[in-house]
Amino acid sequence: MTFITRWFFSTNHKDIGTLYLIFGAWAGMVGTALSLLIRAELGQPGTLLGDDQIYNVVVTAHAFVMIFFMVMPVMIGGFGNWLVPLMIGAPDMAFPRMNNMSFWLLPPSFLLLLASSTVEAGAGTGWTVYPPLAGNLAHAGASVDLAIFSLHLAGVSSILGAINFITTAINMKPPALTQYQTPLFVWSVLITAILLLLSLPVLAAGITMLLTDRNLNTTFFDPAGGGDPVLYQHLFWFFGHPEVYILILPGFGMISHVVTYYAGKKEPFGYMGMVWAMLSIGFLGFIVWAHHMFTVGMDVDTRAYFTSATMIIAIPTGIKVFSWLATLHGGTIKWDP
């Protein structure tokens, strides 16, 4: 098998997982370089970069690189691809060629994001890309359009990956293995994939409407034509809040395995509680998004609902922390590195 065949046309979950890990490590260095620019600018009085726009471009790029090209490829693409098939005893992922496509959509997406910062004035919108700042007046030129296309590609990659993980985790188990016997990391990736599948299409709709507002004279987010910038915020945060749970849920799964192993236990404390806590967090994550929008003004009853729904997420989260501590309790903790 030639180098090209193995690494470019791979249908092997381990090779694709390795590609994700290498890509994520490289993107992580780019993201770290961007954060060093931010710290250098903020580390002393006066200016270093000299311009607010370039600073905002660096902050925006840092966020996108770290979220979409470091954390998600490593935790879902890397660890997910490597571990999910092994943990359920499957020969590979359910759709190996789609798995390869999910990976190879990421480098072009990354290229588009980097391109957005090198043309015109860059996309200095923040990772939320709110209009009217992201509109074609405040951000004339191709920068924001390139950033939107980058998000489109990364989104398609994640949706395909999510379909693959959901199908694999549910359908590729041996007949004797029930869903309640799969390891917690498998559960965490499954729930993460469901969140991706349900939230990303909404982001895609929002940024596509922004794209047409910028280029095709629509007014989805322009009050002059009967639109409303707050609509964009609802669409974005309906994705954006589940996204932060997408970033942490695989970490929950990893922590459960790490804590169990280093406590010298054969299983985590409260397996079913852990599973249902993750399911609850995933579900509740979809009905709390407007707490990111309190400053735009909201009806008192709406504020009361979103506040209390948000606080309820603390309960399953507390169950998880309690169970990790209970797993450690009474164990022979291994202190080796």
Swiss-Prot record:
Mitochondrial intermembrane-side positions: 42-51, 119-141, 214-228, 288-299
GO molecular function: cytochrome-c oxidase activity; heme binding; metal ion binding
Name of the protein: Cytochrome c oxidase subunit 1
Residues engaged in binding O2: Y245
Xref: InterPro entries: Cyt_c_oxase-like_su1_dom, Cyt_c_oxase-like_su1_sf, Cyt_C_Oxase_1, Cyt_c_Oxase_su1_BS
1'-histidyl-3'-tyrosine (His-Tyr) crosslink location in chain: H241-Y245
Reaction equation(s) it catalyzes: 4 Fe(II)-[cytochrome c] + O2 + 8 H(+)(in) = 4 Fe(III)-[cytochrome c] + 2 H2O + 4 H(+)(out)
Role description: Component of the cytochrome c oxidase, the last enzyme in the mitochondrial electron transport chain which drives oxidative phosphorylation. The respiratory chain contains 3 multisubunit complexes succinate dehydrogenase (complex II, CII), ubiquinol-cytochrome c oxidoreductase (cytochrome b-c1 complex, complex III, CIII) and cytochrome c oxidase (complex IV, CIV), that cooperate to transfer electrons derived from NADH and succinate to molecular oxygen, creating an electrochemical gradient over the inner membrane that drives transmembrane transport and the ATP synthase.
Taxonomic lineage from the root: Eukaryota, Metazoa, Chordata, Craniata, Vertebrata
Domain of life: Eukaryota
Binding residues annotated for Fe(II)-heme a, in chain numbering: H62
GO cellular component: mitochondrial inner membrane; respiratory chain complex IV
GO biological process, one term: mitochondrial electron transport, cytochrome c to oxygen
This protein's pathway: Energy metabolism; oxidative phosphorylation
Subcellular location as annotated: Mitochondrion inner membrane
Binding, Na(+): E41, G46
Gene3D superfamilies per UniProt: Cytochrome c oxidase-like, subunit I domain
Chain positions recorded as Cu cation binding sites: H241, H291, H292
Cofactor note: Binds 2 heme A groups non-covalently per subunit. Binds a copper B center.
Subunit structure: Component of the cytochrome c oxidase (complex IV, CIV), a multisubunit enzyme composed of 14 subunits. The complex is composed of a catalytic core of 3 subunits MT-CO1, MT-CO2 and MT-CO3, encoded in the mitochondrial DNA, and 11 supernumerary subunits COX4I, COX5A, COX5B, COX6A, COX6B, COX6C, COX7A, COX7B, COX7C, COX8 and NDUFA4, which are encoded in the nuclear genome.
